[in-house]
């Protein structure tokens, strides 16, 4: 396939080996100006240290760094959290939720600098290529998209290092990289290495943030979360922004080994992959939010929220954030969350986040109605008529069967 003519391209730059190679490769193969874009989504200060100089040393004419941490948690993570989304019952979508905001910010930089193309460093085997390019299609259909991993003939880290060395481009990456990792404020994922064999238990070096639950403190710790409209607004009596609340709970949860999962998931592109994910703060938030929902939502609303969560998990995972259906589901979840206000105490102990106390001014739970003793507000004789009507279709079906 012939290459398109490109004058200026904005590349999503991480500072790692792949994107360090991509910058000179773009200049050589497309004869274009390359602008580096770096998204700060909470991956850690050490990942960002010296990154602008690194990008320019690789050949970028400019480097834009966008602090997206607060926006990501407030506008992407919290809305998804309100749907109750777990992908395939376990995964809290850490990587998936970060991609749409990175893509959106990358498009904004492209518009600012007058670029006519966008570039990402995702491989041709993973989900992220779909997430980025799906977002680009929704936000900037007029811009060309370049995916070097689907074009070049570099197939190993050794070849990538040689490529940079031949061009005298400095790179601190090592030849042997055991694991592939992705981190943001919500989670860190680890893939590859020993995890590629599902019969291998994860090594301790598969975990980065969290303490081994067996080595966690022998004394439990309790955190109190205040929830308003489905969002954590305060922790342990202190009002916090969404990002600061997450950072605080990450620290508390990691100390007690909370939020570890080892999962084999179905990728969008058809294959299965295995990963170890750590989401300490997110796990605590999800448990607290669900506890308030149990108090506040009626049966039909709770069931509907469960359905929304299942669909939302697939839409977010599959890179369909900027679609009408995803927007509609998020809007419905937002409406359901209007009365999800309350306070929850969560016990952190040996890898578990357990709700021990919960209350809400909007609670539909009534001790008077729920009591098993004698009461004045619930006449048990009324239940018989309800059950007869509730089971009417089953009764008619059985009677019809008896006639045959």
Swiss-Prot record:
UniProt xrefs under CDD domains: ASS
Alphabetical list of InterPro entries matching this protein: Arginosuc_syn_C, Arginosuc_syn_N, Arginosuc_synth, Arginosuc_synth_CS, Arginosuc_synth_type_1_subfam, AS_cat/multimer_dom_body, Rossmann-like_a/b/a_fold
UniProt-annotated binding residues for ATP: 12-20, 39, 121
Biological processes annotated in GO: argininosuccinate metabolic process; L-arginine biosynthetic process; urea cycle
Positions with a binding annotation for L-aspartate: 123, 127-128
This protein's pathway: Amino-acid biosynthesis; L-arginine biosynthesis; L-arginine from L-ornithine and carbamoyl phosphate: step 2/3
Keyword Ligase: yes
Catalyzed reactions: L-citrulline + L-aspartate + ATP = 2-(N(omega)-L-arginino)succinate + AMP + diphosphate + H(+)
Cellular compartments per GO CC: cytoplasm
UniProt binding sites for L-citrulline: 91, 96, 127, 131, 180, 189, 265, 277
Primary localization class, coarse: cytoplasm
PROSITE patterns reported in the protein's UniProt record: ARGININOSUCCIN_SYN_1 (PS00564), ARGININOSUCCIN_SYN_2 (PS00565)
Keyword Nucleotide-binding: yes
Cysteine disulfide partners in this protein: none
Pfam family of the protein (one): Arginosuc_syn_C
Subcellular location: Cytoplasm
E.C. number: 6.3.4.5
GO molecular function: argininosuccinate synthase activity; ATP binding
Keywords tagged on the record: Amino-acid biosynthesis, Arginine biosynthesis, ATP-binding, Cytoplasm, Ligase, Nucleotide-binding
Subunit structure: Homotetramer.
Protein family: Belongs to the argininosuccinate synthase family. Type 1 subfamily.
Name this protein carries in UniProt: Argininosuccinate synthase
